[in-house]
Design a protein with these regions (language model features):
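Cell-wall polysaccharide-cleaving catalytic domain and substrate-binding groove, primarily
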Residues: 1-97, 101-156
Length: 156
């Protein structure tokens, strides 16, 4: 869902204050708290991705540097380091590659393989796949609709 139907190759972090409260209620419990990051993508990425997923603290800039890219939107220094090793690239090359059409596909294939998602796909465990990719089930109804449409299109 974050890739906007595979049309976006980088995570869109331009959120209003109200939307920040919905997406990250623990980090932004009210609109007053969210105002500082509203419509400031770099500041937001550095705040919400700080000190997790292998990223440094907020001042390191890692949140922005390692924001979601690719068709599955790999996120965080640790994921990019693993992707770089798999692609035999430097970390900087892997980050740049994930934002290209070819790299967006490469990163999705790598993520799918690294996280062993074929087994879940074979059993149509869409919620479990979603949790592996995004940590929750945001967009589940739309994802289920799109999967049904894809199955219909191939006559399955």
């Amino acid at each position: 869902m974050e890739s906007a139907g595979f049309r976006s190759l980088e995570e869109d972090l331009s959120y209003s204050a109200g939307r920040l409260c919905q997406v990250w209620p623990n980090r932004f419990p009210d609109t007053q708290t969210a105002e500082a990051c509203a419509l400031r993508p770099e500041m937001l990425a550095n705040r919400v991705y700080a000190s997790r997923m292998g990223n440094g603290d907020e001042a390191s800039g890692d949140g922005w540097r390692f924001r979601g890219r690719g068709l599955i939107q790999i996120t965080g220094r640790s994921a990019y380091e693993r992707f770089a090793r798999a692609m035999t690239m430097t970390l900087d090359q892997a980050v740049a590659h994930a934002a290209t059409r070819a790299g967006a596909a490469d990163s999705a294939v790598w993520f799918w393989s690294f996280n062993k998602l074929n087994g879940l796909a074979n059993t149509w465990s869409l919620d479990l796949i979603t949790r592996k990719i995004n940590g929750g089930t945001t967009g589940a109804a739309e994802r289920n609709r799109l999967c049904a449409a894809a199955l219909h299109a191939i006559g399955a």
